[in-house]
């Protein structure tokens, strides 16, 4: 077996990915307790929520208040998910210094999630990158359905690589490949990991797996064998996508 990395970095995405699909709404106080407990447990990167339209994702309607009231622990990176310039400005107003923009490699999923094609979504990110640079906000990127889509089926790696090129042109240095619908398998993860690291050695890579088919941990191991050391995780294994059938 190929030697594994000595160190990995975990981002807790529970406050966002874990809660966005839940029918039971937590109070602001309960969400703050979850975030602050994760920080006390030693998690160094926490995604506190998404700055998106509350009508589309009601569970995230209080993200601005969460950010404003959060007791921030030194040495912990608190980030938020955004889709557009309005979301970025909300994140800025809430004191968030790192925001993640996301686009789906699947056309159908991107239309459901953002009401845009992947090409339109990436094009719209140019003004976000310009604004973020002016305001000294760090942008990271995430590519949903990188390993397949429950709507479109197979998502060619070429589509993913094309989006990576576009994000890199915007100056983004950290990119996550997300298995939004849990369709990835270990061989695919390893091959993708080796390929993208060779193509883009200057990018900080993150992997985000769902456990829809019980392959989550096996895919993490495959990612580690490919040399990728950054992973998203979610407390209690919660999580899913409101716009992707069967994602969990």
PLM region spans:
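Glycine-rich, positively charged N-terminal anion/phosphate-binding segment
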Residues: 28-76, 82-90, 95
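Active-site beta->alpha loop and helix N-cap motifs at the rims of alpha/beta catalytic domains
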Residues: 50-53, 73-133, 137, 148-155
């Amino acid at each position: 077996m190929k030697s594994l990395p000595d160190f990995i970095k975990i981002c807790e995405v529970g406050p966002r990915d874990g809660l966005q699909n839940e029918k039971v709404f937590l109070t602001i106080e309960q969400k703050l307790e979850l975030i602050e407990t994760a920080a006390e447990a030693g998690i160094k990167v926490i995604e506190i929520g998404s700055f998106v339209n509350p009508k589309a994702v009601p569970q995230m309607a209080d993200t601005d208040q969460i950010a404003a009231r959060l007791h921030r622990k030194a040495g912990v990176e608190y980030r938020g998910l955004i889709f557009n310039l309005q979301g970025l400005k909300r994140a800025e107003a809430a004191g968030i210094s790192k925001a993640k923009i996301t686009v789906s490699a699947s056309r159908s999923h991107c239309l459901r999630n953002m009401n845009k094609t992947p090409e339109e979504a990436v094009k719209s990110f140019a003004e976000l990158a310009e604004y973020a640079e002016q305001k000294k906000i760090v942008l990271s990127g995430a590519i949903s359905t990188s390993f397949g889509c429950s709507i479109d089926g197979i998502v060619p790696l070429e589509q993913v690589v094309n989006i990576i090129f576009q994000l890199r042109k915007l100056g983004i240095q950290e990119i996550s490949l997300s298995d939004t619908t849990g369709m990835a398998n270990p061989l695919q993860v390893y091959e993708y990991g080796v390929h993208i690291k060779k193509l883009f050695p200057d990018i900080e890579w993150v992997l985000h797996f769902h456990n829809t088919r019980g392959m989550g941990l096996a895919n993490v191991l495959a990612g580690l064998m490919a040399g990728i050391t950054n992973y998203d995780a979610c407390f209690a294994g919660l999580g899913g996508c409101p716009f992707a059938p069967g994602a969990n």
